């Protein structure tokens, strides 16, 4: 068991050299046991990366990127969390909490709300940090117009920053390739 306290370092995608970017991708893909696609990787790019290193190796990662979520007719500026991963031999060391401290700092400084799509396993962690489960229907603003995303209902969590939200209302995300939420 590792007993040190870790702090995540925030780095924008534009400031990652190619070697570090490749190391992140390799670690995240390994942490997801290969269930991390090319589009999943693309979703992590273009924003801020929270990174934790140990002896030069990346052991934990989360990204926050800008998206628009449509809520009651308003396109809200959202910090969307992607690619939360901890190397297998470092799990259980509260590294995800350090990652979330960093991405939530970005959200508080730049966005109206934070959002993410959570695995069943992680929902309790997000709720314990003040994230709210979205109870209303979810959808995506696809190229053909709004499309319901019922498979994502119950997986979305939000962190209101400077806005009040009714979590039983409809919530729509912007379009992208791959998993839209």
UniProtKB/Swiss-Prot annotation:
UniProt domain N-acetyltransferase: residue ranges: 11-162
Give the record's keywords alphabetically: Acyltransferase, Antibiotic resistance, Transferase
Q: Which E.C. number(s) belong to this protein? A: 2.3.1.-
The molecular function GO annotations come to: aminoglycoside 2'-N-acetyltransferase activity; aminoglycoside N-acetyltransferase activity
Signal peptide range: none
Instruction: Give the protein family.
Output: Belongs to the AAC(2')-I acetyltransferase family.
**Could you give the subunit structure recorded for this chain?**
Homodimer.
Question: In its UniProt entry, what is this protein called?
Answer: Aminoglycoside 2'-N-acetyltransferase
């Amino acid at each position: 068991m590792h007993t040190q306290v870790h702090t995540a370092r925030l780095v924008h995608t534009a400031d990652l050299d190619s070697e570090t970017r490749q190391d992140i991708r390799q670690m995240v893909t390994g942490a997801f046991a290969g269930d991390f696609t090319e589009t999943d990787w693309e979703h992590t790019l273009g924003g801020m990366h929270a990174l934790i290193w140990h002896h030069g190796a990346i052991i934990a990662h989360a990204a926050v990127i800008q998206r628009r979520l449509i809520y009651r007719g308003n396109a809200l500026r959202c910090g969307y969390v992607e690619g939360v991963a901890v190397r297998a031999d470092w799990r259980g060391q509260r590294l995800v909490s350090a990652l979330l401290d960093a991405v939530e700092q970005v959200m508080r400084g730049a966005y109206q709300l934070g959002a993410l799509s959570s695995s069943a396993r992680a929902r309790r962690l997000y709720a314990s940090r003040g994230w709210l489960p979205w109870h209303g229907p979810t959808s995506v603003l696809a190229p053909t117009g709004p499309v319901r995303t019922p498979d994502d209902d119950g997986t979305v969590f939000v962190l209101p920053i400077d806005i009040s939200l009714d979590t039983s209302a409809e919530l729509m995300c912007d379009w992208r390739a791959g998993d839209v939420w």
